[in-house]
Amino acid sequence: GTILECTPKDWDFSFNLNARAMYVAIRAAVPKMLEKHAATGSWASIINMASIVASIKGLPNRFVYGASKAAVVGLTKAVAADFVQKGIRCNAIAPGTVDTPSLADRINAFPDPVEARRMFVARQPMGRLATAEEIAPVVVFLASDESAFATGNVYSVDGGMTI
């Protein structure tokens, strides 16, 4: 919904799920990453899941989701800046609409799920939804040494939604 439909409970749920969860996980992992870097010189990689519906692009009726995913982008860049000289890289992936069980739940909540799915697909320039298998190689790249010089970046995998 819009800001007018977003209750404080909706706001808290979305921010807890999308931003706070990443904060908690990163805060727990960073001390061990720092220890390992100090002992071995090896670098660690944090990969966050943002969305193109964040600071990259706004979509109607996605107010709190977009705001919470924009927080993920900010968190990613802040962590990258804080730890770039301490052996930790931090990047985010910003997918477009991915065909997941979560999306299926949202679609099935519409009065006409067939029409809802058609609407989700229609906003994709490629004419289809992404699959998790299309996002996974970006995760592998960011976790690997192939991306050793990348930090603080947001990688869009959106089927052309942002062009």
Would you name each region that the model predicts?
Residues 84, 89, 150-152:
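Short, small/polar-rich loop/turn modules that mediate ligand/substrate recognition or access, typified
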Residues 92, 114-146, 150, 159:
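C-terminal helical subdomain
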Residues 2-3, 7-12, 120:
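Substrate-binding pocket helix/loop in short-chain dehydrogenase/reductase
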